[in-house]
Amino acid sequence: MKSIVIFGGAGFVGKHLIRRLTKNGHKIIVPYQRSVQEAKIRLLGVTGQVIPFRYSSLEDKRLKSVLNNTDICINLKTTYDQKKGDFNNTIYKFNQKLIRILKSSKELKQFILFSGLGVDIDKNSTRSIAVHKSEKEAFKQLDNAIIIRPGVIIGGGDIFLKRLLPIFKSSFFVPLF
């Protein structure tokens, strides 16, 4: 049974990933900073298999201890604070600090960064640039970094579909998913 830390595990993709990994018997730790419904996260696996973990910053000694004792670190946290839109701090600097912690760990962990669709340094998007810089940093600092560039992801429980549902109800057309 591997121990896996998933940053961003309370999100849409994270919940589906946790369900899949818990079916395979892995222990999941979900660090979070903001308010999260811990009970819903705990119920994604059997009792004690999924552990929500509140931390204040990446410099938190308890978080560093958790990262030192885990097999795999997955970062799904490549979204941004919608109010501030400060991509450099919320994406790049977070990943930079996380990579530095993993590199200084006694056992170098498998690091998986969930990147973004169409990420490119040549784009005018500050988010795209921040994610691209994070990818470069991961490859430069860690030998076993994996970057996953997803396509468009929608599904049950997704905010996108919830917002479209009223339009579908009043429309003659029904999308087939």
Positions of predicted regions on the chain:
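N-terminal Rossmann NAD(P)H-binding glycine-rich loop of SDR-like oxidoreductase domains
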Residues: 3-26
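The conserved SAM/SAH-binding core of class I Rossmann-like methyltransferase domains
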Residues: 31, 76, 148
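Structural motif
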Residues: 3, 71-72, 110
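Conserved Rossmann-fold NAD(P)-dependent oxidoreductase catalytic core, especially the SDR/UDP-sugar
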Residues: 79, 93-141, 145-151
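NAD(P)H-binding glycine-rich loop region in Rossmannoid oxidoreductase-like domains
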Residues: 44-97, 101-103, 117-123
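N-terminal Rossmann-fold cofactor-binding loop
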Residues: 31-36, 56-57
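Glycine/proline-rich active-site loop of Rossmann-fold NAD(P)-dependent oxidoreductases
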Residues: 155-163
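A conserved pocket-lining segment of Rossmann-fold NAD(P)-dependent short-chain dehydrogenase/reductase
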Residues: 166-177
